Swiss-Prot record:
Amino acid composition bias (Basic and acidic residues), ranges on this chain: 47-57
UniProt function note: Regulator of type 1 phosphatases which maintains protein phosphatase activity under strict control.
Any one Gene Ontology BP term: intracellular monoatomic ion homeostasis
PANTHER family associated with the record: E3 UBIQUITIN-PROTEIN LIGASE PPP1R11, E3 UBIQUITIN-PROTEIN LIGASE PPP1R11-RELATED
Record organism: Meyerozyma guilliermondii (strain ATCC 6260 / CBS 566 / DSM 6381 / JCM 1539 / NBRC 10279 / NRRL Y-324)
UniProt-recorded name of the protein: Type 1 phosphatases regulator YPI1
GO terms under cellular component: nucleus; protein phosphatase type 1 complex
Pfam families with a match to the protein in the record: PPI_Ypi1 (PF07491)
Amino acid sequence: MAQQGSSQMRPQGTSSVTQTTTETSASPILHLRPSKRKSKKKPSVRWTEDTVDNEHMNKKKTKICCIFHPQRQFDDGSSCESCSSSDSSSDGSDTEDSKPNAYEHQPHYKNQSKVPQ
C-alpha cells in the first residue's frame, strides 16, 4: 500500500484571501462659459447733433478747492527777512504786476431784478 503525498498534506480548513481594489473615479470638471450675446457690437456713446462740446469753451469751474499763488524768489529784494510768518497777500505788499487769477476776479453783475411796488 502506497501513500500518496500524505507527508505533504495540508490541514483542511477554511482559508480566505481578501483582495481590496479601490477604484478612483475622476471628479467632474465644471467649465464656466459666458452667455452668448445677441450682437457682437460693443456699447458706444451716441451724440446727437444738438450736443454741445463744452470742453474748450473757456468756462470757469464752479467747484474750487484752492487758489494758486506763485511763490516769490528767495533772492527777491522786496521780501523782508525780519517779517513774521503771518504775512498774507492781502496786506498790500503785492507788486503792481500781480493780478488776481481767474477765480479771485469777481465779475460785476448788474442788478436787473425789479421789486414790485
